[in-house]
């Protein structure tokens, strides 16, 4: 999980979602997981 000021999809399978007001990227590739904060 990477914590970044700006989250962007890295590949085609990355999905940008919101959980409890936090923007996150979820993907098949665990390296692509990101969280805004």
Curated annotation (Swiss-Prot):
NCBIfam families: rpmJ_bact
Annotated GO CC locations: cytoplasm; ribonucleoprotein complex; ribosome
Family: Belongs to the bacterial ribosomal protein bL36 family.
Keyword Ribonucleoprotein belongs to the record: yes
GO biological process per UniProt: translation
DNA repair recorded as keyword: no
Coiled coil: none
Keywords: Ribonucleoprotein, Ribosomal protein
Protein name: Large ribosomal subunit protein bL36
Molecular-function GO terms, alphabetical: structural constituent of ribosome
């Amino acid at each position: 999980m990477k914590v970044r000021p700006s989250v962007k999809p890295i590949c085609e399978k990355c999905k940008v979602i919101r959980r409890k007001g936090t923007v996150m990227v979820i993907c098949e590739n665990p390296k692509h997981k990101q969280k805004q904060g």
